[in-house]
Amino acid sequence: MNKIANMVDTNSAAADAALAVWLEMWNTDSEIARRICSDDFRIHFLNPDQDGSNPGDDVLGAESFARFLDSYREQHPDAVFSEVTRAVDGAHGRMLWNVQFGKVAAGGIDVFDFTEGGLIREVWSVAGTRAHLT
């Protein structure tokens, strides 16, 4: 990675505000994606579906992501995400989260890149097999 080419002077308060509603968006309101994600938004799920596919690869932009979230909630209506911790450092951020599927719990981490204005431009997401301890 070329450090100089990838330096962005990001509005950290706006970036943190985007992360503050990230899980609300996953849990209840896909419209939030249109406010906090950039037009060139991408998400990379590093855990594929059971059949080896990765529908997140087709997401490009906030509108596309909002549709993806609606589809996800239709397929997983009992999923509830909760924040463990988050941090923003310039153009980058991270969030540790837990998800509850009925009696099953797991944890994960999302790593974010932000635009200059604090919109989420890109996310790398990894889910684990056990929840984070809180």
PLM regions: where:
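C-terminal and inter-domain tail/linker signature
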Residues: 1-134
